[in-house]
């Protein structure tokens, strides 16, 4: 269960931006709120509002990048391989991600900062008995451990500067970091198309019914200055290159 996500210095996001599922004191629709324990009250859903080019999609992109670095292709980096770093305006300072979540009844806080070449900072805390406890922290190559220290020291020595310790420790089946890793793998999911559904949108415009009206309304709300959209069919000549066999026959 996601509680909070924080991103700083990613794409159009310069300063710290926070998505929080923590509920306010408003009692409206209280029956729909989530209660993971006696103290926490969370929202079941939230929406991100903002003007065009305000960075809404980049917040989601930051979450996807964080997951990609933990359980995706970017987690499989070799020593010296570049990380997916996209800082604001070409700045040189590291990008930071942090995720707060609950998995199997335990609260976790995991975060890291990085640039294209290395991980500068990384940390994982949990609250197994309602009290904060450090699993590991890492800053400029210096690690700190409070649990299973000897094994973690060995694993940290095997972790290159450009790889997350959460990833490498799970490669070696460290039990202390397994649950946090599994949350990213199993629970953090994204339901969105990577490419725009152009053909579907065109079909809705051609239909000319309520679907087109809805599209025009969305364009109006976006304040793009577009009042109508029409589809025009045009004919064109399609040229295909002859196959090598056809070229031999024509000689």
Predicted regions mapped to residue ranges:
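Extreme N-terminal starter segment of soluble prokaryotic enzymes
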Residues: 2-3
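Short acidic, glycine-rich loop/turn motifs
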Residues: 7, 101-103, 126
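N-terminal pre-Walker A segment at the start of P-loop NTPase domains
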Residues: 7-34
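Conserved RecA-like P-loop NTPase ATPase core
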Residues: 9, 52, 59, 219
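Glycine-centered tight beta-turn/hairpin loop motif at sheet-sheet or coil-to-beta transitions
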Residues: 12, 103-107, 129
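Conserved P-loop NTP-binding catalytic core
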Residues: 34-41, 45-47, 51, 57-119
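Electropositive, glycine-dotted interaction segments
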Residues: 109-237
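Single conserved hydrophobic/aromatic residue that forms the stacking wall/gate
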Residues: 239-251
